[in-house]
């Protein structure tokens, strides 16, 4: 175990939209350290999202992310030999990273199209409140709702 909590690293905003959120998405999409390739994929996807939604790319992107961010999640806790799934509120930074992770995972799971197109389609679905990433969020919320009876075990 650590003596102290690890310090959060500052993420530099991206050069085009000047936004930290876009940089985080680029870092999530990046494979094997190929950042320039990841940047191309993300910027193309944001353009496609903007065209489809008829909104500025950052507005549409932020709405899509907010539609995927979970508010609650469950964590296992052992109480007297039984393991209960206990609902916890999700901190803002974790909610954001989970949302990005789910969107990228859902985009990668699609097949038969270029990655930028798959990412754009998943972002459009998230913007509209549909899609795999939004379904994942609803599943997590459903599990939290089911474990509501054990919420008093939080400590």
From Swiss-Prot:
GO cellular component: small ribosomal subunit
InterPro entries, sorted: Ribosomal_uS7, Ribosomal_uS7_bac/org-type, Ribosomal_uS7_CS, Ribosomal_uS7_dom, Ribosomal_uS7_dom_sf
Keyword set includes Ribosomal protein: yes
Keywords from the named record: Ribonucleoprotein, Ribosomal protein, RNA-binding, rRNA-binding, tRNA-binding
Pfam families from the UniProt entry: Ribosomal_S7 (PF00177)
GO biological process: translation
Entry's family note: Belongs to the universal ribosomal protein uS7 family.
Membrane-spanning parts: none
Protein name: Small ribosomal subunit protein uS7
Quaternary data: Part of the 30S ribosomal subunit. Contacts proteins S9 and S11.
Molecular-function annotations in GO: rRNA binding; structural constituent of ribosome; tRNA binding
Keyword NADP assigned: no
Chain's role: One of the primary rRNA binding proteins, it binds directly to 16S rRNA where it nucleates assembly of the head domain of the 30S subunit. Is located at the subunit interface close to the decoding center, probably blocks exit of the E-site tRNA.
Gene: rpsG
SUPFAM superfamilies recorded: Ribosomal protein S7
């Amino acid at each position: 175990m650590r003596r102290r909590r690890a310090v959060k690293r500052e993420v530099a905003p991206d050069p085009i939209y000047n936004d930290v959120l876009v940089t985080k998405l680029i870092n999530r999409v990046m494979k094997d350290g190929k950042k320039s390739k990841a940047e191309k994929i993300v910027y193309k996807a944001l353009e496609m999202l903007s065209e489809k939604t008829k909104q500025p790319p950052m507005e549409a992107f932020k709405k899509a992310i907010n539609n995927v961010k979970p508010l609650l999640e469950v964590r296992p806790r052992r109480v007297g030999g039984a393991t209960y799934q206990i609902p916890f509120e999700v901190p803002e930074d974790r909610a954001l990273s989970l949302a990005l992770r789910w969107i990228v995972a859902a985009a990668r799971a699609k097949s038969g199209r270029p990655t930028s197109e798959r990412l754009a389609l998943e972002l459009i679905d998230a913007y509209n409140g549909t899609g795999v990433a939004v379904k994942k969020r609803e599943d997590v919320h459903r599990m939290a709702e089911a474990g509501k009876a054990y919420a008093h075990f939080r400590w």
